Amino acid sequence: METATTLEIASCSQRQVEAAADPADAKGPRTSHQQEAGSPSLQLLPSIEEHPKIWLPRALKQTYIRKAGETVNLLIPIQGKPKPQTTWTHNGCALDSSRVSVRNGEHDSILFIREAQRTDSGCYQLCVQLGGLQATATINILVIEKPGPPQSIKLVDVWGANATLEWTPPQDTGNTALLGYTVQKADKKSGLWFTVLERYHRTSCVVSNLIVGNSYAFRVFAENQCGLSDTAPVTADLAHIQKAATVYKAKGFAQRDLSEAPKFTQPLADCTTVTGYDTQLFCCVRASPRPKIIWLKNKMDLQGNPKYRALSQLGICSLEIRKPSPFDGGIYTCKAINALGEASVDCRVDVKAPH
């Protein structure tokens, strides 16, 4: 508590009452009866047992802040005996009795506002007077409310996965300083709003890490001690996050030469067959470019002979001997030829009569 006292000390001295001017006064002393009849009573001020003081609560030494619509109820302890005279003023003027009520007690004074409004903000002064003495105290009350929305928001630029925004401050800050701005984004598909910046102090920003292929809208709220503004402006244009065109540059490389001369990886196998049963011979060859396959029997070319059917696919060479007879026995040769060379494999085929 702090004592706020302004003393004005009135000089209280007794005054001697002189008799009215009379010719008999100059001639001699007056009798006692004459003195009693001619002297008025002495006028004395009432005795002050306790000087007026105001004990201001510590919380009211700073600006007292309330939200619009809340109740203001201030109890200020005072002292003074006999009971002092208490008066309140608002910005130097008398209180509006339709909005503010005051109750003065023996030891306190109460200031009450049922629903505070911004017009109730200002300097309230309490004055306690007793005789020629007085004490004063000053209380600053600030009534605040939510700010208005920013006046506009504009999508300035979009590049890569980023978007640049600009906006202007609100016209009404709610009777107090702004704590900052809250920036939110929403993609066109879901329509859900997500906060990207809170209590941001500038009026422009860059929103990053946007998803490629989505289109975004943005909005900005203003914020003060009461909270966020009730509404927020939304960007008129959507930010389309385009997928960057990918440019492929083929790296130079030396082509491998896969050409090779024919080479048999699986040779022909000798076999014995029975007269009248079809027989097949197999071998595998590798070559590039594709080789020409020639089958020989006892070094005689079998091409065009209907008794034999030769096939070659994916490097697998086969020769079918249809219903062989003892005359079909002998040495069979498979020869592969291309531009890089040739190769050949042999096998012996024996044909026996059935038992």
Swiss-Prot record:
Residues the record lists as Omega-N-methylarginine modifications: R322
Keyword Zinc (UniProt): no
Record note on disruption phenotype: Knockout mouse hearts exhibit a 36% reduction in fractional shortening and an increased diastolic ventricular chamber size. Mutants show cardiac conduction system abnormalities with aberrant atrioventricular conduction and an increased rate of arrhythmia.
Fibronectin type-III domain segment(s): 149-244
Tissue: Expressed in the atria as well as in discrete puncta throughout the right ventricular wall and septum.
Domain called Ig-like C2-type: residue spans: 46-140, 262-346
Biased composition (Polar residues): 1-16, 31-41
Domain of life: Eukaryota
Statement: the UniProt record of this protein carries the keyword Disulfide bond: yes
Region described as Disordered: spans on this chain: 1-41
Main location: cytoplasm
Localisation: Cytoplasm, Myofibril, Sarcomere
Protein name in the entry: Myosin-binding protein H-like
Species of provenance: Mus musculus
Record gene name: Mybphl
